[in-house]
Structure formats: structure tokens, C-alpha cells
Amino acid sequence: MNVAIVGTGYVGLVSGTCFAEMGANVTCVDVDQKKIDKLHVGEMPIYEPGLEELVKRNVGYGRLHFTTDLISVLDDVEVVFSAVGTPPDEDGSADLKYVLAVARQFGQNIKKYTILVTKSTVPVGTAKKVKAAIQEELSKRGVDIPFDVASNPEFLKEGAAIKDFMSPDRVVVGTESKRAEEVMTKLYQPFLLQNFRVIFMDIPSAEMTKYAANAMLATRISFMNDIANLCELVGANVHNVRHGIGTDTRIGAKFLYAGCGYGGSCFPKDVKALVHTGIENGYHMEVIEAVERVNDRQKSIVYDKLTRLMGDVKGKTIAMLGLAFKPDTDDMREAPALVVIDKLLKDGAIVRVFDPIAMLECKRRIGEVVTYTENLYDCADGADALLLMTEWRQFRLPTWNVIQKVMTDKYIVDGRNIWNRAELEELGFSYTRIGEK
């Protein structure tokens, strides 16, 4: 099966590579020539465990190709996936200019029945705009070529995207025709041989499903952070509370870990877009609006705890472990670490940082305003306080007696609740975490 993927960002590159791994002939298209040139020599534009190996293998087998020219591949493909960016506008709405640009180019150049599938996260009603843009271009050409539009939202977790794509919980597809449904069934059949979990539905419902899923997960995170903050005030322990409610089969334990807030490319953007969709339709999403407010507040909690613990940070050296918004990625979009760094620098603190993967991304974003270190022990050397912002596995069991010797003072704020209070207090650290008094 011949497939084109427009956009070689996180969603597009992972999707295209996984389709190729299952035997499809895939061409990934991107307008960024530098990105395509790097992919041709095996350089990945993103970090995702296992992706580089998978890309190189499928390029070697001749199943995965890269180009800047969509027109050159349209004659041969049955399906075109649009996986371009939908950055938020100032009002929180999704900017569809790239999505509609793909639709117009599709309409200007198709010569036979082809399906344009939107993989990007887009507001409800986008498919209508995509279809209208294609039809307008066909009318300009004076041709009547059959086509379909479809919605196939992604549900990939950064750091586990390949596993998620190759063994999905479910695949959601919104279609308008039986013909499109048959093509999408054929495409996804190899991924779901034992249990065909493709859920076909109308397109608006598919578009809404993506936003609803991310909003639900974001809600659980903000809910638990709100509970954690109250636990601190009343003397409860959020870990016990989480266990008490997470074992209820109606609730479940996932996404109930208190911390310093969510970030990344999806939750913040999609929550804002869902709120904006409600406003556009005369409805206030009051729960979702609260989710966003709680998260914005929670991103500062590590800073707030630090200043309560040690007072004025001016002239103090603060070591920060973790920069990415979560482990196993270099993504720093909307990362809580950026909020804390900004507050510390404004207060006159000296900030040292370490992240196993996201150091280059941090330099790209904020430059040399912080000191970049080689490892967690180097980061802690000479520090007055140590902050944990990202729960990388390699941070879980540090050699604390070494850290105790190299730190100038002994303040620790655990923003992800992974360290042992008793052990650290026995070593003389002043330790605080989320959701405990």
C-alpha cells in the first residue's frame, strides 16, 4: 500500500515509520529542506526511543522515503496523511493554515481517487473546511475527481510512541464513506490482527474524541494536584489518598500522580483549544477552564516550596534535575522547568541544570543564562538547593552521600515525589515534596 505523510514532526515521522515497518511504502513529505536532508543521512529531528533504529531499517529496506515535493508522490499514493502543526493562536484557538495549505495542494494536484486523512489534532468542523478547500481547487481546475476526507487522531505518548502505534489500545477513524472505511481498514489491519480495535465513527465525533481524551487526562492531573495541595494544608498524605482512590475500579490508578504540572505539545494546547471551541459555540467549559488554571499555578509550586524552605534565593546556587516536560523525550514545550528557571533568574539565583536528553533543546530555547552540567553530581556540586523537575529513571536512586558532600547547603524540593523522605532527612537534608505536610 502506498502512503504519503505530510509533516515530519513527532506525529508524522513516528506514524510514517511505523506504517513502513508493517510493509507499507511510505513517503514522508516536509517543506523544511534541512529536515529532509538530515533524515536522508539518518539524523532525527526529534528524540523518541527506538525511532532512529526503525527509520534507518525501513530506509534500508526501501520502504521509507523523504522528500519536500508532495506533488511528485500524489500519483502513486492511495492515502495522504496530514500531520502538520496546528499551533495555538493568541486566543487559544488552533491555527489551521498549514492544514488548509495541505488540503489546497491536494486539491490542486490529485488525478485519481485519494483519501486525505487528518492526523493532526484539529477542532471539530475542520474536516468540513478541508473538504471545501479541496473542492474549491478541483472546481478551479474544472475537474470532478472523487476523493474522501477522514479524521484519524493520534493517541501517542512521547517516550512510548512506537509501542503505542504498533500496539494501539484502539484506532479512531472518522469517515463519510464506505470506500474510505475499507481503505483505512486495510491500512490498519496488520496492527490489529488478533483484535481489530478500529472504531469507525462520524468525522466530528472523531475530531472531538481527541480533544476529549486529552482534556480528561489533563483533568485527572490537575484534580490530583489540587487534592495534593489540600493534603498539605490538612496533614494528609497524597500518596495514601491516591492509593485509596486509585484502587477503586471506577477510577483506576493512571494519571493520579501529584507533581509540578503537565506540559508538552498536547495537553496545554488542546485544553486551550477545547475551551476556545466552547466559547465559539456560546458555551463555557468551566471544568476545563479550571484544569488550565490549576496547572498554570502548579508549575510554580517547586519555586514556591523552595522560597518557603530557604527564603531569599538571590545569589544562591540552585541545581535543577530535569528540563523536559516528562522523561524519555527532549520536548520542553510548556515544561514546568522553564517557569521555575525564569522565576529563579528574576530573583537573582544562579541556576545549574542537567537533563539526560533535553540539554541542547534548553540551549536552543534560553541560551546560556543557566550553567549546563555533565551529570546529576556535577549539577549538585556547590549548590545550595536541589530541585527535581523531571522523573528520569537515572534520577531515582542517586548516591546521596556523594551529593551530601558536594552540596553547599542541603535543601531539596522533589517536584515529582520519587525520593525517600526518611533517607534524606537522616542525611541532614531539608526535604519537601508535593502533597505532604
Give, region by region, the residue ranges found by the protein language model.
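Structural/interface elements that position substrates and couple domains in central-metabolism enzymes
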Residues: M1-K437
